């Protein structure tokens, strides 16, 4: 998936917290950019979504961080706003909320907000830049016209490659000065092959800081887990596109040479006519011409077939227009805890795992295009899965929020598109055998299995520090991230991804640094803080995660 840093960014944004009185749980999280040139993960740690419910989630963005950050900001409220949630039907509420936020990504208002998060210029900004560029070209042409209007004939001839001290060059028509070079002009008229060209911009500005999610309890380290506070620096990746200001000058023709150029063109046409006559005299038959036409028709048909196949295999961005939410998206795994019920919704390949008497119990299913159910839906929607497991040669996920480039079949509902935002739901009744659960992105699960992660945490969760206190859960997560980090980028990409992980213990822990309930920030407060921070941090970089 794109470029890596020369050295991994191992700065971690970590935090710990406790639950509400009715949910005496504890949690710790950490997030690390790693080898990636930007951080595209986000998360939620909300121990009190309402007085009876806690919410924990991880979002793994691809094609940019904007959709993941948008989900972390708005999905909690969208879940609560669902009619099913108010009726206590949490499974239905999660399904409806996933589809609702996915649909919002196609609205003009949300697209503009996503563009701001991603640091991409809006259409208005593009139009202003285009007008400014055209004004610059007009000013350059006016200056050139003024300069050439004051020049002598000898100076003009010298500028355009003519020598006024020699006789006129011979042409086949017996007159004229030949064709002038097309590098510049006298009167500002553009040549047929030389309109101003602009290098296409990928709009990848310099990498900016990214926060990793929203939490509403005590945190430490960089405190980037709190809503809206900038997370770890993502490292300077530098600009990834050519400057749009480096333009070729518009080529203009000189009126002074128009007559000679017309005469030269006539001479060339006469020469072409004579060549055609000589070819016929040399025995070039009409039958041979027909054979060549048949061959041309066959080649054109083959080219048409290739173009159709390429169109089917197009990936976001190939159409020349990039739009957040269309060429970017995110996985989402959301866990709600209410009383003794654990409800987990998942779309994508982030994962939730519960430790049940030391055994890993998967509470989510990784959605991959090559899976039988997913493959059938993709084909029914008109898509293909390549040998390397990519939908139409692009995305290697089969469910995600966003990615509306793959959701354009108007004959099918949202849940039946090539890429669907409809989550799978699993429900578990918690017992004393269930000690903790882990929610993490595939940066963890691509390196370690569910059981390996459970074993790793199990071996450290009872450890105590020098003061006799149990280790903070976030410190265990930090150690897990370091364990998963690859030593270099020479391999297949394993251990080189962004990493975000949350550990939630279903029972309270005796740790000195955890703050009491009174120290907790309300969700509304952190959301308002996020809005203020985001307005001052618009220089973000688009990073492709299609791997």
Curated annotation (Swiss-Prot):
Mode of membrane association: Lipid-anchor
Family per record: Belongs to the PP2C family.
Name of the protein in its database record: Protein phosphatase 1G
Pfam families: PP2C (PF00481)
EC number: 3.1.3.16
Biased composition (Acidic residues): 123-139, 259-313
Top EC category: hydrolase
Protein's UniProt keywords contain Phosphoprotein: yes
Organism name: Macaca fascicularis
